[in-house]
């Protein structure tokens, strides 16, 4: 695809950035992220309304990640010759449809169908977002355009959980998803208005992505990515029942905790470049080790609200290093195939999200309240050990 983008640049002779299109892509990414994480803050009322356990309701996160995993791997190959403008419009339609299906769901099955639609849009859009952005601006402006995209992601991660918790208490969880559907409609119209025609990739340029896994250290890196994100979702998906039952937070208190977590994540993302300049490998090993210790502290002393709040802030600050760190690892260690490596990374992350949420939900329902924390801490510790022992890092 990178060669195709280069050729396309030459043919189209992009001389000025299309900022309206860039911001429309950023807005769509932000909406997808917000809707992906809404169930985290609405898990309890959703479960009560549908007559299911919180662990089962958490599988609405699982199915989204599961479908997104396959979408990220295969959708760009399936739609090679299709104009990307129409594909992005389709993703925005799927986002809107997902929100409406969830808001009107009267059964767990319909809820899962709605969340599967979101997974298709999420995985496909994430797999294409960077290459889309690169085709909307001149080469010299690509870093700035990408910063807009990832800035939107950071903002979405900050506001998604606390906004969902606050609005859920105010207007009910179904109306929260109705409001998200309205955002989806805005996405559709903005994309139609601003996104130009973007021809698809010629079929003769199709290459085997999975051969990258045969390179030294790459498989170990992908396993480490899997364990770190599975550990994150095993904990974060069930943060509401854990914090409300273990630490005794009410809805208002939980909203503040989630807001603190989101702000800490934003700060961590902002500071990550300074930390990664010193040592990427140290950051990739040190961050999950700190998270493993945090999970242990929360398991032992999480009934204290101050301790629980402190752990949430430390978790947000520390985990923010992990996605940025692994992206940096790809650009350094797999620079010649960064786009394909990024596609595998997205799929691995979505698979990890699926497994983490699924196993965490099973543990919550069948083992106990702190079991998702113990699972998360164990995975984070294993990640730190694997990175230290096996992951290779090329110097910049």
From Swiss-Prot:
Transmembrane feature ranges: 22-42, 55-75, 86-106, 108-128, 148-168, 176-196, 216-236, 256-276, 282-302, 306-326, 344-364, 367-387
- Molecular function (GO) terms listed? antiporter activity; purine nucleoside transmembrane transporter activity
Pfam families from the UniProt entry: MFS_1
List the membrane topology term(s). Multi-pass membrane protein
Protein name in the entry: Purine ribonucleoside efflux pump NepI
Q: Where in the cell is it found?
A: Cell inner membrane
Keywords on this record? Answer: Antiport, Cell inner membrane, Cell membrane, Membrane, Transmembrane, Transmembrane helix, Transport
Entry-linked SUPFAM superfamilies? MFS general substrate transporter
Q: Record's GO cellular component, any one?
A: plasma membrane
Which PANTHER family does the UniProt record give?
A: PURINE EFFLUX PUMP PBUE, PURINE RIBONUCLEOSIDE EFFLUX PUMP NEPI
State the family it belongs to.
Belongs to the major facilitator superfamily. DHA1 family. NepI (TC 2.A.1.2.26) subfamily.
Q: Key word Transmembrane present in the record?
A: yes
Instruction: Provide Periplasmic-side residue ranges.
Output: 43-54, 107, 169-175, 237-255, 303-305, 365-366
- Provide the catalytic activity annotation: inosine(in) + H(+)(out) = inosine(out) + H(+)(in); guanosine(in) + H(+)(out) = guanosine(out) + H(+)(in)
InterPro entries xrefs: MFS, MFS_dom, MFS_Efflux_Transporters, MFS_NepI, MFS_trans_sf
Task: Keyword check for Transmembrane, yes or no.
Answer: yes
Q: Which residues lie on this side of the membrane: Cytoplasmic?
A: 1-21, 76-85, 129-147, 197-215, 277-281, 327-343, 388-396
Known function? Involved in the efflux of purine ribonucleosides, such as inosine and guanosine.
């Amino acid at each position: 695809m990178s060669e195709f983008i280069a050729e396309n640049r030459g043919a189209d002779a992009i001389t000025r950035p299309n900022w309206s299109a860039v911001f429309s892509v950023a807005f769509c990414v932000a909406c997808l992220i917000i809707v992906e994480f809404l169930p985290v803050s609405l898990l309890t009322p959703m479960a009560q309304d549908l007559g299911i356990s919180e662990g089962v309701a958490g599988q609405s996160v699982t199915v989204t990640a599961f479908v997104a995993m396959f979408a990220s791997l295969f959708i760009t190959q399936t739609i090679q010759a299709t104009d990307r403008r129409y594909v992005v419009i389709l993703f925005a339609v799927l986002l809107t449809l997902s929100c409406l299906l969830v808001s009107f769901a009267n059964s767990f099955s319909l809820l899962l169908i709605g969340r599967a639609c979101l997974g298709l849009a999420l995985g496909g859009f994430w797999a294409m977002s960077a290459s889309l952005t690169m085709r909307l601006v001149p080469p010299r402006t690509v870093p700035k355009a990408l910063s807009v995209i990832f800035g939107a992601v950071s903002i979405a991660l900050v506001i998604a959980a606390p906004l969902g918790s606050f609005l859920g208490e105010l207007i009910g969880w179904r109306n929260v998803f109705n409001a998200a559907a309205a955002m989806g409609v805005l996405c559709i119209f903005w994309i139609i208005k601003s996104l130009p025609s973007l021809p698809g990739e010629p079929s003769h340029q199709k290459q085997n992505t999975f051969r990258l896994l045969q390179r030294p250290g790459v498989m170990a890196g992908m396993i480490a990515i899997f364990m770190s994100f599975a550990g994150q979702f095993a904990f974060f998906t069930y943060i509401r029942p854990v914090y409300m039952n273990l630490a005794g937070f009410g809805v208002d208190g939980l909203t503040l905790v989630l807001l603190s977590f989101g702000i800490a994540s934003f700060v961590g993302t902002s500071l990550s470049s300074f930390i990664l300049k010193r040592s990427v490998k140290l950051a990739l090993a040190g961050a999950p080790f700190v998270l493993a210790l945090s999970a242990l502290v929360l398991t032992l002393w999480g009934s204290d609200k101050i301790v629980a709040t402190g752990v949430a802030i430390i978790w947000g600050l520390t985990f923010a290093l992990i996605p940025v760190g692994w992206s940096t690892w790809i650009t350094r260690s797999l620079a010649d195939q960064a786009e394909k490596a990024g596609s595998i990374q997205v799929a691995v992350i979505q698979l990890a999200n699926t497994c983490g949420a699924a196993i965490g939900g099973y543990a919550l329902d069948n083992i106990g309240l702190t079991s998702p924390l113990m699972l998360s801490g164990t995975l984070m510790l294993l990640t730190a050990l694997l990175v230290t022992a096996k992951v290779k890092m090329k110097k910049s």
